[in-house]
């Protein structure tokens, strides 16, 4: 919806935070001021907002709103019980997995690698979550402007997994990992074998 206005939700967000004892400010970021890396995966139809509030230390949450997202995704209602019970509509895990795989294969970071994409890929496979091909296909076509079969995607994925410098992947993800020894098994071959375990839906 190109006419979507996230700003109309600001008062409700601010009020909910106030009821929890937090004073928040929400500002819209100007995409023209983004660096090359930050803007590498943002579309023209994505608006970015910063939500900031003070706790023991200052905290900022980045919110991205895509007003023209790739379709063919599924959603589900999930119950949240903190800070009080409420229902939230969210994308299903197989569709989130599709978004992660699109990022892993197509994200261009020049000389950098986003190790968190690899960590998440491992998580989805280890927990046996299926990957939604319909949504992944929509993302690929929107991003590249070209058709892509599942087998072609698997070829691109295997190429990325086989040729990426795993030490760079580990270095990027290390600050976010509680037990660094769990990365000892990481190698190109390890990720290629994980890819063989992907369940498609």
Predicted segments, located by residue:
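Structured mid-to-C-terminal alpha-helical surface segments
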Residues: 4-201
